[in-house]
UniProtKB/Swiss-Prot annotation:
Interacts with UvrB in an incision complex. The gene is uvrC. GO terms for biological process: nucleotide-excision repair; SOS response. One of its GO terms (molecular function) is DNA binding. CDD domains: GIY-YIG_UvrC_Cho. The keyword Cytoplasm applies. Keywords: Cytoplasm, DNA damage, DNA excision, DNA repair, Excision nuclease, SOS response. This is UvrABC system protein C. Residues 16-94 form the GIY-YIG domain. GO terms for cellular component: cytoplasm; excinuclease repair complex. Its main location: cytoplasm. It comes from Shewanella halifaxensis (strain HAW-EB4). HAMAP family: UvrC.
Length: 609
């Protein structure tokens, strides 16, 4: 505990009401946020002489000040605690790092509604289905829906601009309402059935389709009956792929496992008795934290995060009981205005779901620990191979990617002792150089990386350069200039490709003395170098391809006087791509919304050269 903080004096002023407390260190940084039913009793427990919890001892040793906020109830305190944790991200709290909004399927409010992927604020009018565990689950669902229900998925601008059916109609995945290929009544019926399907009422949809097929066959409308038959077949295949539970209703099932500093919460999302999706979460956990606190903190942030727009089911099953379960349920109920039960003692199908979630969480932690141990071992082998006297904490690797000098991009990827640190990855768009000059590109990238070195604080111990002696010399020169007055310059190592570019034959070169050396092909140290080199190459080439595609799609059109981003987008969407725009006649161009006859002629002349 800081010498400036007088715990006894402070505790005399604390009330016994419920509330939230914030603990600060000597730099006035919030290091812990907690809540209590009785603030005085809870805060007094931190300053007992017989503290045995190592984490609490470490926390108390850094306390310089404490702020207290009194609330009306313990439920209010829970909600405020979550808000403060999100705001301050305290060092000693369990932190749920995933804070992205969840994706939904949107059925728009339109004469001919469309099905679309949606993430973010619900500004568009319509029905929202979800949330889904991830974007891939939404896209897979949309793909399946297209096979069963021929409902449009194009945006409204594309819909308005159509004069003939698109490819989706030709392959049977859209009924082309844009050009009147389906009656309004039939289209709305497909929308109704899709809505039922998205609500999990497969059996009801099946009954309707079977009835329609039988009626069409009875009326000798055999072609229509065949369409219904195909819909039924597709629906049955999809339904068979989903695991069905005898446990009715909606529930979240949480399997919690914590070992060797790694925690995983595996969630099964059960909707209408089916496994709607699953997802694993790996919160940041302070050392020596109890499992019960980890689970409580995770659920607090997961279910009270207003930014996620999450719809919580009435039933939550958890594999580990913890104190304040009832209080947390009340807080969720207050936040979402619905009754919620948190259960641990369950039987039958629910118990089976809990076992499944716990198995997945356990396997995920063991896999992470195995990977973590492998990475750690490779770091040790690398330290031994290069005879490093210091522990390597951070490594970076640079690579350059371009096509004949076009759209040059440099990548910087970062590894720490747990593996890739993707939050620290950076790309640099290279400009103002002679196309294809890799040396100039490397110089610009390294210069930009270390331009603000005095305030960065994140200096790599080793800087790998994917290239030969020439690029390494350029990088070493920049580093020498940037670190001339500093003593923490990184060690530079060039990674030159071996004969035939075969892995295992790489030549490694020290930047300082240009001494070269090799490592055995089966060396764990070399595998680590190959890993960061390959990741740098992947990250660079992905950025380059994206930039090149964007340039090719935009520069040709936007270089034409009068064609800005909006007109470019309208042209590409209406006609289907850049090649189609180039091949369009003036009469076809003028049909695009926002393109006058004069503008159409200008575009036509510019593209035909």
């Amino acid at each position: 505990m800081s010498d400036v903080f007088n715990a006894n004096q402070f505790l005399k002023t604390v009330t016994s009401s419920p509330g939230v407390y914030r603990m600060y260190d000597a730099k006035a940084v919030v290091i812990y946020v907690g809540k209590a039913k009785d603030l005085k009793k809870r805060l007094s427990s931190y300053f007992r002489k017989n503290l045995t919890n190592v984490k609490t001892q470490a926390l108390v040793s850094h306390i310089a000040n404490i702020d207290v906020t009194v609330t009306h109830s313990e439920t209010d305190a829970l909600i405020l605690e979550n808000d403060y944790i999100k705001q301050y991200m305290p060092k000693y709290n369990v932190l749920l790092r995933d804070d992205k909004s969840y994706p939904y399927i949107l059925l728009s409010n339109h004469k001919h509604p469309r099905l679309a992927y949606h993430r973010g604020p619900k500004r568009d009018k319509g029905l929202y289905f979800g949330p889904y565990p991830n974007g891939g689950a939404v896209r897979e669902s949309l793909h399946l829906l297209q096979k069963i229900f021929p409902i449009r998925q194009c945006d409204d601008l594309y819909y308005k601009s159509r004069s003939r059916p698109c490819l989706q109609y030709q392959i049977g995945r859209c009924s082309a309402p844009c050009v009147g290929k389906v009656s309004l009544e039939d289209y709305q019926e497909q929308v109704r059935l899709a809505t039922l399907f998205l609500k999990g009422k497969d059996h009801q949809v099946m009954s309707v389709l079977v009835g329609k097929m039988e009626q069409a066959a009875s009326d000798m409308r055999y072609e229509q009956a065949a369409l219904y038959r195909d819909q039924i077949t597709a629906l049955r295949r999809v339904s068979e792929q989903q695991e069905v539970s005898n446990a009715s209703g909606d529930m979240d099932v949480i399997g919690a496992y914590y070992a060797s500093g790694v925690a995983c919460f595996h969630l099964l999302f059960i909707r209408e008795g089916k496994i709607f999706g699953s997802r694993s979460y790996y919160p940041k956990v302070p050392v020596n934290t109890e499992v019960s606190e980890v689970l409580r903190s995770f659920m607090l942030q997961f279910y009270l995060n207003s930014d996620s727009q999450r719809l919580t089911p009435k039933e939550i099953l958890i594999s580990e009981p913890f104190e304040e379960q009832d209080e947390l349920a009340k807080a969720i109920q207050a936040a979402q205005n619905k009754k919620v039960e948190i259960k641990t003692q369950v039987r039958g199908e629910r118990a089976s779901f809990l076992r499944l979630a716990l198995t997945n969480a356990t396997n995920a932690v063991n896999t992470r620990l195995s990977h973590k141990n492998t990475i750690e071992q490779r770091f040790l082998l690398l330290e031994e191979a290069i005879e490093s006297t210091n522990k390597i904490q951070r490594m970076e690797c640079f690579d350059i990617s371009h096509t004949m000098g076009e759209s040059t991009v440099a990548s910087c990827v970062v590894f720490n002792r747990e593996g890739p640190s993707k939050a620290d990855y950076r790309r640099y768009n290279i400009t103002g150089i002679t196309p294809g000059d890799d040396y100039a590109a490397m110089k610009q990238a390294i210069t930009r990386r270390f331009d603000k070195i005095s305030s960065s604080g994140k200096i790599p111990d080793i800087l790998f350069i994917d290239g030969g002696i020439g690029q390494l010399r350029i990088a070493q020169k920049v580093v020498d200039e940037k670190f001339v007055a500093l003593d923490n310059a990184p060690t530079l190592i060039g990674v030159a490709k071996g004969e035939g570019r075969k892995p295992g034959l790489e030549t490694l070169i020290y930047g300082e003395n240009e001494e070269s050396f090799t490592l055995p092909a089966d060396s764990g140290a070399l595998h680590l170098i190959q890993h960061i080199r390959d990741e740098s190459h992947r990250f660079a080439i992905t950025g380059h391809r994206n930039k090149r595609q964007k340039t090719r799609n935009t520069s040709t059109l936007e270089s034409i006087a009068g064609v800005g981003p909006k007109r470019r987008k309208a042209l590409l969407q209406y006609l289907g791509g850049l090649q189609e725009v180039k091949g369009a006649s003036v009469s076809e161009l003028v049909k695009v919304p926002g393109i006058s006859l004069e503008m159409a002629q200008t575009i036509h002349d510019a593209l035909r050269g």
